[in-house]
Amino acid sequence: MKLQITQAFQRHFEAEPLVVFAPGRINLIGEHTDYQEGFVFPAAVTQGIWVGIAKNKLTVCRAFSLDFEQEFCFELDSMSPRKGHWATYIMGMCTLLHQAGYPLENFDLVIGGDIPIGGGLSSSAALSVSLGLALSELFAFAIPKKNLALYAQKSEQLFAGVNCGIMDPYASAFGKQGQAMLLDCRNLDHQDVLVDLGDYGLLLI
């Protein structure tokens, strides 16, 4: 998938991108308890969202979705996120970072992934987190992952109209291979837990 993102970026924008990945997630224990300030036990999955990004010298940002095969342009000083459009998540994160004082510049973006949209694996959280990570690295913002997870949650709530909790973006930002995490949603403390199933596996139905 990383190669697909890189090649698509080269075709559309004739430049070399920074490529960043954020995973989707499953939840093993604690469904719907994150927005009740309870405990949850999510784990990252190998599928997720990839973004390719680079600065441009234009007056607009350009975003291309591999899944929808659409390009969308917007200006950083006049963003209008609207429900039901894939670019809402991009403009939502940019709006919140701008409001937090991060000096964004115009950029080109390609997004794609191998996670089913609407499949219950938090593709929207993975998109917001991957974009946040990419912007933070591209512009040397060094935004803490916890803050990125909170921005991703707020973006979905304010701009996509989804009453989501913190679990999805937090698991996407902090998930590690071979581990789940016990997350206390009261204070966002978490503990990584090794998941070694031996000869067994997990089947999601």
Model-flagged regions — what are they?
Residues 1-121, 125, 132-145, 150-154, ...:
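ATP-binding N-lobe of GHMP and related small-molecule kinases
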Residues 164-167, 171, 175-205:
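Mobile "lid/hinge" segments at catalytic clefts and subdomain interfaces of large enzymes
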